[in-house]
Amino acid sequence: MERGILTQEYRHEPVMLGEVLESLQLKSGSVVCDCTLGGAGHSVKMAAQVGETGRLLGVDQDDMALEAAGARLDREVPGVPHQLLKGNFGDLDELLCSAEVPGVDGFLFDLGVSSPQLDIPGRGFSYNEDAPLDMRMDPGNNTLNAAEVINTYNEHDLARILRVYGEEKFASQIAREIVRRREQEPIETTGQFVEIIKAGIPAAARRHGGHPAKKSFQAIRIEVNHELDVLERGLDAATRWLNPGGRICVISYHSLEDRIVKNHFKEMSQGCTCPPEIPVCVCGNVPILKVITRKPLVAQPDEVERNPRARSAKIRVAQRL
């Protein structure tokens, strides 16, 4: 990518910005960690809230995002201390140890693929552009990519991934078609994969519910990046590092992510689990978090119209006791 357009490509409208800022309740001097830095759309505003006596930590595994975000923060909030950490938020413990922070007052997780990643065809996230099948959040790592999943996993495992991670009704048919096609030639591009998906879905079903490849692309992306395992580890670490009164704000975009967030907050907010017939608690469980959002926040209609990515966004918030 041309260096001159790097920052421009990583500028996008942050989802539910007002709700995020209101939910985190940051103040001057707070330490805040944006676990999904991206183009720093949320981070710039959070940095402005914590001010020169506060501190912003930004986590991302994408070198392009880190470079663009760093330039934007230097330009728009030059007086606010900020530290950018390259890595996966599943490794939040190690990253925060390296940053030498005693605790954090606010965590933001904006899950899913950023708009700029979708817009760069060579990354292989988009079903609207023909590109190599990659889908790695950190393309610099020599790790599993989408082409390897599609060309080497057996039919049973492919069907399971498409069904569980993509909630794809026609998972078995698509998996069968993948295996049939790869016996003829390797499946190497997003264009090939889209055609295979279409062939595995009945024509009548393809006419409804958005792009027919959306669910399958989501499923393969989650498998490549181990997104659900990473989310669970990230939430566990954030809960441990959160200062009393601090908050975790999570924006999710599909039911699998939202369920993990909901269950984590529920588990961490439970107190005694002893049976009612036991008069004195013996389990020792104490609540760690207080759930702030009994029901998730959703984007207002005007934002959805302006920013379609916000359509499926849900925010859940919890506070450290």
Residue ranges and their predicted role:
Residues M1-L321:
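S-adenosyl-L-methionine-dependent methyltransferase catalytic core, i.e., the SAM/SAH-binding region
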